[in-house]
Amino acid sequence: MSVLALSTAGMAASAAHAVEETPAPAPAATVVDAASDSSGIDRNAAVTAVPGTVNEPGSISGIESSVAPGLYQTAYSPSRNSLYVTSAVGRPPVSQSSLIKLDADTLAYQNHAVPEIDPTAIDREGKPLEGARYAVYGVAVDDERGTVWVTNTRQNTVAVYDADTLKLIKQFDKDIVPHSRDVVIDAARDRAYVSSARSNKIAVFDTSTNTQLADITVGQDADDFSAMSLSLDEASGTLVTVSASSAKAAIIDVASGSATEVPLPAGVARASGVAYNPATGRIYIASQGSGDLVVVEKDGTVVNQVVTATGVKDAEGKDISSGALNVALDSVNSLVYVTNRNAGTITVHDLDGAVRQTIDAGRNPNHVEFDGRGNVYAVNKGGSRDGSTKNDYVQRFSLVAGASPGAAPDSSSAPTSGFTDPGGAAADPTSSSLSNGSSSAPVAVTFGAAAPGGATVAAAANSVPEVDQRGSSLARTGTSIGVGVVAAGLLLGGALLMRVRHCA
């Protein structure tokens, strides 16, 4: 492990390092009140159960709503009980984008804002990009100050909105954070941290003054370390990120700016998602190229490396990875959620990494986020499952409490995945009990969400890697998963072995 230090004095943002706030014109976001607009938002979108999830004790239950096209990330506000969702459709010029506010419990529409057009947008040849907006991608809520921070990836910058009205507070200058991706808020220190997917920097902003401070540097350059997702433990001031360009993670002390690199297994390719567990010091990493979830200790010791789906193929029938993209830690229920873009699934893991349930997430699941109270939110970027709308799903998942087992499904029905005890010694998804966050109170196995259909999983051959943030229109995806579950029939002296079949 190597240590790269940035002095505390540097973090204090001297005149030589700080980026001055300039009076450059800041376009005002349009808060939309018209009955319809170009955002494509369905204000009355129906809320339905996620296919295959069941409201049974010990299982993951989910609801979803096709809110708008081009969904990218979510962020939860505890004080408002609102969910903020970003939307950006297509490739440059991105003319359709919005910041959407939903009720966090019901997913009902509350409000949305449409970013203004960027009048200076140009393509690689210097030609004007007419209609290009300050499209929003990454998102985080500062509840202390009542603001929402977003990344404008196409313009390499960030913006700040009012959390209640969604009016623009500040649009930062363009080209200050190369390919700005994730943003997290450190309310205790009045800081916002923004990852730069095309550099080896973490941009730092003062949230009390809305000014940019000195960057945090990780690695030698973008080829050595390109920061993707961010995971912050505010209590200890620990910021964790992962590199898409190398098999590394990094643990950053935000007080000093020092970054300690953590080596990952050599097979890890195009890592993008990261979640940090401060209680154990473990880091959870989702990697698109290798299609796996890797669990490592702070020193790089590998706890587990789990392929999240097999049998995934592109439209030409070629084998591809699951496209494990983002990861979230549910610290309330001791579970880890991973979005698998190519497989069209969300896999639920225990804290050791073993798969406990596979959920049909729709096509191209993109982001997953924990709200701190036992719920996990996700979005996809592939429209509806049946193709009836281009609007993507916002989904909310939670573990159903209770100890009563659900009825074993008919073996001829759609495949389901069972839970096992996250505290168990074996990293085997065929174990027979689940602990809902307490090792002393296991609950009997129940049957959770059905895996999406298809013995072979089709994804479009021209799918765009998420790091490019271009979106795509991929063919319907799914996964082929076999799970054996030893059921509660053991109590009757017999063992019921259920073989989950491949099905469409």
Task: Please provide the spans of the model-predicted regions.
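C-terminal low-complexity, Ser/Thr- and acidic/Pro-rich disordered "stalk" regions positioned immediately N-terminal
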Residues: 400-475
